A protein has these predicted regions:
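Extracellular lectin-like interaction modules
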Residues: 1-294
C-alpha cells in the first residue's frame, strides 16, 4: 500500500500456444492492492488474446482492491478469441471486494472479449460477499463487450453494489443481466441504469437484444426489484439519449420510491407500471399509454 500518494498498477496477460489464465491483473484471496490517505488508485489490465479461457482484464477473486480515501478506477479489457470463455473485462468473485474509502468515488470500466463463448461480460460481479462499494462516494460501472452474445454488465449470485451515504450509483451499458439475488443499493439516493450508446432502445419488462443496430437494453421486473433507491432512473436524455422506450411487461420496482424514465424518443407503455410515490417521464417525443400507471 502507499502512504498517501497515487498508485497505478498496469498488467498485460501473456501466454503461448494453448496456455490459459492470461490475466492482465489477478488479485487472489489474501492479497490486496491499496492506496493510503487520499491517494488515488488506478488499476488497468488487459487479458491475453489467445483462443483460450480465463483471459480476463482484471480479476479480484477473494482479494481486494481499495483506497483509504481517494478515488478508485479500474479499467479492464478482456481477451480470448474464437469460442473461448471467461474473457470478462473486470471480474469480482469469491468474496472479492473493490471499494473506495473516505470520500473516494469508484469507477469501473470493463470491455468483454469478442469471443463467442460464455462469461465474456464487460463487468461481472458474482458470489456471496463479493462487493463493489464506497463509504461516502459515488459508483459508476461502465460495461460493454466486443461480441454479441454477452451482457455489458452481469451481476449474479448475491453480488452487491452499494454506495455509502446515499450517493449515486450509475450503471452505463447497452445490456444488463441481474439475477434474483444480486443487488444494487444507493440507500435513499439515485440509481441510474442508462444506455451507453446513443439511440439504444430500452425495453422495461423485456430482454436485452445483444446484436444488430440499434441494440436494446432490457430490464426485467425481477432485475428492477433488486434495486434500492430513493429514485430509480432508467435511460438518459442528454447528448447520448436513449432511443424509443417500451414497457412490454408489468414492472413494479418495489425497493425504489420513485421512478424516472429518460429518453430522446417515443415511449409506449403497453403494460402496468406500479411505483410507490412518483413516476416521471422525461422523454423527447410522444407518450402512448395502453395500460395502468399506479
Amino acid at each position: 500500500p502507499s502512504s498517501g500518494g497515487a498508485v497505478l498498477v498496469t498488467g498485460i496477460g501473456e501466454g503461448t500456444g494453448t496456455s490459459s489464465s492470461g490475466y492482465g491483473v489477478l488479485v487472489q484471496s489474501g492479497t490486496s492492492i491499496t492506496s493510503g490517505g487520499t491517494g488515488t488508485l488506478t488499476v488497468q489490465g488487459t487479458g491475453s488474446n489467445l483462443a483460450t479461457n480465463l483471459n480476463r482484464g482484471i480479476t479480484v477473486t477473494g482479494g481486494s482492491i481499495g483506497s483509504a480515501g481517494g478515488d478508485v478506477t479500474l479499467i479492464g479489457q478482456g481477451g480470448g478469441a474464437g469460442t473461448s470463455q471467461n474473457g470478462q473485462g473486470v471480474r469480482v468473485d469469491s468474496a472479492g471486494v473493490v471499494s473506495a474509502g473516505g470520500n473516494g468515488n469508484l469507477n469501473i470500466t470493463g470491455v468483454g472479449s469478442s469471443a463467442t463463448g460464455s462469461n465474456n461480460a464487460g463487468v461481472s460481479l458474482t458470489n456471496t460477499n463479493s462487493r463493489i462499494s464506497t463509504n461516502n462516494g459515488t459508483i459508476h460501472l461502465v460495461g460493454s463487450t466486443l461480441g454479441t452474445s454477452q451482457p455489458g454488465v452481469d451481476l449474479s449470485v448475491n453480488g452487491v453494489v452499494q454506495s455509502g451515504a446515499n450517493n449515486t450509483v450509475t450503471v452505463t451499458t447497452d445490456s444488463y443481466s441481474g439475477d434474483g439475488t444480486a443487488s444494487i443499493s444507493a440507500g435513499t439516493g439515485i440509481v441510474n441504469i442508462r444506455n451507453r450508446t446513443a439511440g439504444t432502445l430500452i425495453n422495461l419488462g423485456g430482454a436485452d437484444v445483444l446484436g444488430g443496430s440499434p441494440l436494446t437494453l432490457g430490464l426485467a421486473d425481477a432485475e428492477l426489484e433488486r434495486i434500492t433507491a430513493g429514485t430509480l432512473e432508467v435511460g438518459r436524455n442528454d447528448a447520448t439519449a436513449a432511443g424509443a422506450i417500451t414497457v412490454s411487461a408489468a414492472i413494479s420496482p418495489t425497493l425504489a420510491s420513485n421512478l424516472t424514465v429518460l429518453g430522446g424518443g417515443d415511449i409506449a407503455i403497453g403494460a402496468d407500471v406500479t411505483v410507490a410515490n412518483t413516476l416521471v417521464l422525461a422523454i423527447g417525443a410522444d407518450v402512448t399509454v395502453a395500460n395502468t400507471l399506479v
